[in-house]
């Protein structure tokens, strides 16, 4: 599926993780723990209720119903890494949504839509969850 959004309306980034000595059989958990980290970071920094829909959708509540506001993808990078891609609709208005079941942090009444603040919170949460997973 395609993900489209107007310029500067979302938070879109990739992170290269190198799990090192963690057995490859456990790497399948990386997109899931990233989802938890993204949901945690956004809940803290944007002040919105978040939920995860298996296996990689980030949901927010808009008008009393859950809507997809983001997603997580993972792809193996060589023999020793995994690239995690994250996309979150931050400031999209209702008329900018690609499909009716989509949402954004702004439509979920986020207390902050500053992308720098949101990114820092998500990366801090990812660092925490990734560290726990590695041990």
What are these regions (language model features)?
Residues 4-10, 14-135:
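Catalytic beta-strand/loop module used to bind and position nucleotide/cofactor moieties
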């Amino acid at each position: 599926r395609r993900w489209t959004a107007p310029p500067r309306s979302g938070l879109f980034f990739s992170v290269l993780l190198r799990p090192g000595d963690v057995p490859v059989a456990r790497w399948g958990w990386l997109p899931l723990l990233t989802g938890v980290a993204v949901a945690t970071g956004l809940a803290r920094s944007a002040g919105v209720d978040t939920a995860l829909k298996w296996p990689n959708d980030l949901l927010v509540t808009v008008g009393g119903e859950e809507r997809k506001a983001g997603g997580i993808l993972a792809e193996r990078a060589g023999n020793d890494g995994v690239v995690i891609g994250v996309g979150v609709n931050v400031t999209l208005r209702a008329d900018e949504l690609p499909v009716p079941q989509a949402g954004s942090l702004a439509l979920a009444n986020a207390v902050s839509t500053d992308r720098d603040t949101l990114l820092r919170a998500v990366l801090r949460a990812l660092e925490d969850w990734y560290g726990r997973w590695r041990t």
